[in-house]
Regions:
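N-terminal hydrophobic/helix-forming segments and targeting peptides
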Residues: 1-467
Length: 467
């Protein structure tokens, strides 16, 4: 039986006192700031899922990873990877224990909310040329007007050759924009609901206004724009039907605050988890269990398709490793553990009514865990066991990693799910984890550098030591 405590002793020993991780330790600030520099460079190089996959592959090759060969057997310590359809990456370090004794997975996604061009996007109206767009993921449409935009993508030309491009990122590049009404003529627009402030059919990107010098040509501005694209990239209008082209904010990742304690950027969701997961995988040496880092695609629209987590590509990779080694993949799945890494909402004092402060997650308090996610009555949640939460948090406590646990926001205001359930459906225990984000799904999201660094430390400890 525990000894009886005084009220003061009880307050000291029994109550949970949340702390801001960087307030107590100067070394954390320095290490977090240094780690954030690499992250900002990654963000600037990886504004689309294709670019994120390419940037990740470059880092893996520089670290000595070799391409996965399905029928080959691998020895402990070897590092392998593959890229799924140019848009998702799987990397692994072979562990000392057999595959049947389980994998250790960290899964994040590298797609972000954005605007995609439609199959036939180019048109002219009143001596302007435009691209029609189709929004991807849960954007708030009104946030995308009147700011500089860049256009990234790839054309597959009629001859089968590919051409990749990005316009709007270099200081000497032109940029693009979606126009909005002036307030002097905005009376009718002001009566719209916020969600309809700018409607989907009004998300048209302004791309030109010069015409070809030929009075007989109809749609002379459209043709002039197309001629410029043809001269630069060798494409025709028909090539847009064989293209994947995305419109993203043109700004770079920047430090936020006089103290530079935060990072503002497009694409924190979910590259703020993907980058530290990748770096932890790269730096893992001689792990106990085989580690698998997955940077997946299509999370923002339900994880469907051949590059999403509802596809089998990750699980086929694990099965192929097992089969080449003559081991049982069912046993391997049953003994595996996964961290599903996706962002969560940081408590925002300016919008406090959307949150429940006792169960919110806060920027600067460390990486956030979620025993469950989902909407309303935990709909579509993957609910981790108390034992799994205990195993992971004990590892972090033993190594001085700052962590917090909570929920997305006030009940019944909305909610959100993650890719955890698609891993859990394979019989693999999963715990949700992520970095808190201010202004999530906006063109300029904000994170705290300390939380980014604590996510990296969590993934590194899990990959190296989790047993």
């Amino acid at each position: 039986m525990s000894e009886k405590l005084t009220a003061k002793q009880a307050a000291e020993q029994l109550l949970y006192k949340p702390e801001y991780a960087a307030d107590k330790r100067a070394d954390v600030k320095e290490k977090a700031a240094a780690f954030a520099e690499g992250y900002k460079a990654f963000l600037n190089a990886a504004k689309t899922e294709r670019e994120a996959a390419a940037a990740s592959e470059k880092l893996l090759l520089e670290a000595g990873y070799e391409k996965f060969e399905p029928k080959k057997t691998y020895a402990p310590g070897q590092k392998i990877y593959f890229v799924q359809e140019h848009k998702a990456v799987v990397a692994a370090t072979i562990g000392r224990k057999s595959f049947e004794e389980g994998f250790r997975l960290v899964i994040a996604h590298i797609d972000s909310p954005r605007l995609d061009l439609r199959p036939n996007p180019l048109y002219e109206a009143n001596h302007f040329s435009y691209f029609k767009t189709h929004y991807y993921g849960g954007i708030r449409k009104y946030q995308w007007g009147t700011m500089p935009l860049a256009i990234h993508g790839v054309f597959t030309r009629a001859d089968g050759s590919n051409v990749s491009f990005a316009v709007g990122e270099d200081e000497n590049d032109p940029v693009f924009c979606i126009t909005d009404l002036l307030p002097h003529l905005g009376a009718e627009q002001n009566d719209r609901k916020l969600s309809e402030g700018i409607k989907a059919e009004e998300l048209n990107v302004l791309i030109g206004s010069d015409a070809v010098e030929d009075a007989d040509i109809k749609e002379a501005v459209k043709l002039n724009t197309l001629m410029l694209l043809h001269e630069k990239y060798g494409i025709t209008e028909r090539d847009f039907t064989r293209a994947e082209i995305e419109v993203v904010p043109a700004h770079k990742a920047r430090d936020v605050g006089f103290d530079r304690s935060m990072v503002g950027s497009y694409g924190h969701d979910d590259r703020v988890d993907a980058y530290p997961a990748l770096m932890a995988e790269i730096e893992t040496k001689d792990p106990v269990h085989t580690t698998v880092c997955v940077l997946t695609d299509k999370e923002e629209i339900g994880s469907d398709g051949v590059t999403g987590m509802q596809s089998m590509y990750v699980f086929h990779f694990m099965q192929l490793l097992c089969r080449a080694a003559g081991q049982d993949d069912i046993l391997a799945f049953q003994n595996s553990v996964c961290l599903s890494a996706d962002v969560t909402a940081a408590y925002d004092p300016s919008w406090a009514n959307a949150f429940e402060p006792q169960n919110g997650t806060y920027a600067g308090r460390g990486v956030a865990f979620f025993k469950y996610t989902g909407s309303r009555g935990k709909s579509s949640a993957s609910d981790a066991s108390a034992e799994l939460v205990g195993d992971i948090t004990r590892l972090l406590d033993a190594n001085g990693v700052a962590w917090q646990i909570g929920e997305l926001g006030r009940l019944d205001l909305g909610g959100g799910g993650t890719i955890a359930k698609y891993v859990a459906n394979r019989g693999i225990p999963v715990l949700d984890i992520g970095v808190p984000v201010l202004s999530m799904h906006s063109p300029f999201e904000v994170i705290h550098k300390t939380d980014l660094y604590m996510a990296y430390r969590t993934f590194a400890l899990f990959c190296q030591n989790a047993d």
